[in-house]
């Protein structure tokens, strides 16, 4: 993009720096790995090792060359395949977009070819994924790599009919099973799945750090109790915090291999991502978002932009605003059905250009090719989440840009990123853009705005201490957000039950109601005035 910040969204490049280290041997109860390989990935992610030189089976090689169209392994594939093929357990640390999925699928397939063939109905390889979208993507890649093998892959996750999944697993082979933790436990409890994993050969935890961040530790422990101890276990993770180290100590056999494709001197973020931070009044956020995207579209014809928001309602509001502006966008978040989410993800993945409004269902692991810009609007849930979102761009050795847009009350978060190569990017709202956006905001469904208000209240309620807000100040700012920023015709109602769950009972300024008006977002009941700016949303369902 280049240049100084301006109304077209251009910026000057920052300097790079930052580091992150690993100390697995010091984790409580953890044994040091017998094999510790550091292979820092620089620039292009492709290694000099051809797949043909790795001793893979003929059906696997045929799938790699004819279906996947690969010739050479990426660095993480090159470094992890040898120890995995030797039968070692592996903990691999690698950046997003580095080819981790193929890195664990290929040797898992090869492991299936060793020893007696699996009995009909057996699950020989179990892969845990933190999100439905990532599980679907892994399943598709597994099917491609299994094209010329007599093995079958299936996927199960929440949001779909569990009876249909059960029937599909009962009526078809399930050599490879990709699953989200919650739905897998459902099948253990209701589908008599335990006997089918009794001879499990390989367990994979993909995006292990996110599995733990999302609170799946109890589920993982329960899953481990169902499967045999004599198995090969593979942990792939973008970061290796203490939680992951503890899982490694519990799940991996002594003498496991630790493969670090990031290294001590490298930042947790991809060095090919140019990063910017803009702190601007909340009133200006929506206008700046439109301004940034419009400018990027003008400068990059084959643009692909992902905008991340704290939750589903914030995502919905932004998407409806862009529709009101006559700017088509892809919308993906937990309030949409799984069918819609899958279709939207596929459309954006296959598109030559486009803009996606997303909650964190797209933040990890999902491979959207050629994303040129990632914009994060509002407070990320953690430093790790900032990094994972940023990882949607600059994949497979390509370059990309990322911008974090914060309000002054969110600026404390920048301290968590001080070791990353982020440059300040002051920005001003173009008056013409502000006028057009305000008019469009007036056409957004008022119910969408009301839901965004409640979500905003819930989200920032969890960060009051960090922002130095009392509960009274929180409510005052939420009300100003609804009336002055979103332009709601009156103070939105909020259910008494919701207020109680937020711990806001007795706080003055809330419009308590026993029930909310019917109908949902997506219509055009009008917004009662343009308002200015934009906010986050509650930490609702993902």
Where are the regions that the model predicts?
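A short beta-strand element within the Helicase C-terminal
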Residues: 364-378, 401-404
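Intrinsically disordered, low-complexity accessory regions that flank the conserved helicase/ATPase core
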Residues: 1-50, 522-542
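Non-catalytic terminal extensions of ATP-dependent helicases
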Residues: 4-8, 432, 439-542
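Conserved AAA+ ATPase "SRH/arginine-finger" region at the nucleotide-binding site
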Residues: 238, 258-265, 277-283, 377-380, ...
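Conserved helicase ATPase core of P-loop NTP-dependent helicases/translocases
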Residues: 164-168, 315-321, 326-363
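Conserved segment of the helicase C-terminal RecA-like domain
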Residues: 388-432
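Conserved Walker B
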Residues: 181-182, 208-211, 312-315, 361-362, ...
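SF2 DExD/H RNA helicase N-terminal ATP-binding lobe
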Residues: 3, 11, 38-303, 310-313, ...
């Amino acid at each position: 993009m280049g240049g100084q910040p301006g109304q077209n969204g251009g910026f000057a490049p920052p300097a790079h720096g930052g580091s992150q280290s690993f100390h697995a041997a010091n984790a409580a109860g953890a044994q040091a790995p017998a094999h510790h390989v550091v292979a820092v990935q620089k620039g292009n992610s492709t290694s000099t090792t051809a797949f043909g030189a790795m001793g893979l089976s003929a059906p696997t090689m045929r799938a790699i060359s004819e279906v996947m169209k690969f010739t050479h392994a990426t660095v993480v594939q090159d470094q992890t395949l040898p120890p995995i093929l030797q039968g070692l357990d592996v903990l691999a640390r690698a950046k997003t977009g580095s080819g981790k999925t193929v890195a664990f699928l290929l040797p898992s397939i090869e492991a299936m070819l060793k020893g007696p063939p699996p009995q009909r109905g057996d699950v020989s390889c179990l892969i845990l994924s933190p999100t439905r979208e990532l599980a679907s993507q892994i399943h598709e890649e597994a099917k491609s790599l299994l094209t010329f093998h007599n093995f079958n892959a299936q996927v199960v996750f929440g949001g779909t009919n569990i009876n249909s999944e059960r029937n599909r697993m009962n009526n078809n082979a399930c050599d490879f099973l990709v699953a989200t933790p919650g739905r897998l436990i459902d099948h253990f409890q209701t589908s008599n799945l335990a006997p089918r994993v009794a001879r499990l050969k390989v367990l994979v935890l993909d995006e292990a750090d996110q599995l733990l961040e999302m609170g799946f530790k109890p589920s993982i422990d329960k899953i481990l109790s169902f499967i045999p101890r004599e198995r090969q276990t593979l942990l792939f993770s973008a970061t290796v915090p203490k939680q992951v180290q503890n899982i490694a100590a519990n799940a991996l056999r002594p003498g496991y291999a630790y493969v670090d494709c990031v290294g001590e001197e490298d930042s947790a973020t991809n060095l090919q991502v140019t990063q910017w931070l803009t702190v601007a009044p909340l009133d200006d956020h929506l206008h700046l978002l439109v301004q940034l995207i419009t400018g990027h579209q003008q400068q990059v014809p084959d643009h692909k932009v992902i905008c991340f928001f704290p939750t589903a309602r914030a995502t919905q509001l932004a998407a409806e605003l862009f529709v009101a502006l006559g700017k088509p966008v892809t919308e993906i978040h937990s309030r949409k059905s799984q069918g819609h989410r899958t279709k939207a993800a596929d459309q954006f993945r296959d598109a030559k250009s486009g803009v996606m409004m997303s909650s964190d269902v797209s933040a990890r692991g999902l491979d959207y090719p050629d994303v040129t810009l990632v914009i994060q609007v509002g407070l990320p849930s953690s430093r790790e989440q900032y990094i994972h979102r940023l990882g949607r761009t600059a994949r497979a050795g390509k370059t990309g840009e990322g911008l974090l847009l914060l309000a002054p009350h969110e600026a404390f978060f920048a301290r968590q990123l001080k070791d990353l190569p982020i440059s300040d990017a002051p920005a001003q709202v173009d008056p013409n853009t502000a006028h057009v956006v305000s008019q469009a905001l007036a056409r957004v469904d008022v119910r969408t705005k009301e839901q965004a208000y409640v979500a905003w209240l819930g989200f920032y309620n969890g960060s009051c201490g960090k922002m130095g807000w009392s509960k009274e100040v929180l409510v005052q700012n939420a009300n100003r957000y609804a009336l002055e920023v979103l332009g709601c015709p009156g103070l939105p109602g909020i259910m008494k039950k919701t207020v109680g769950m937020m711990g806001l009972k007795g706080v003055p300024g809330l419009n308590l109601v026993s029930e909310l008006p019917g109908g949902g977002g997506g219509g055009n009941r009008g917004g009662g005035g343009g308002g200015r700016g934009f906010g986050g949303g509650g930490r609702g369902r993902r």
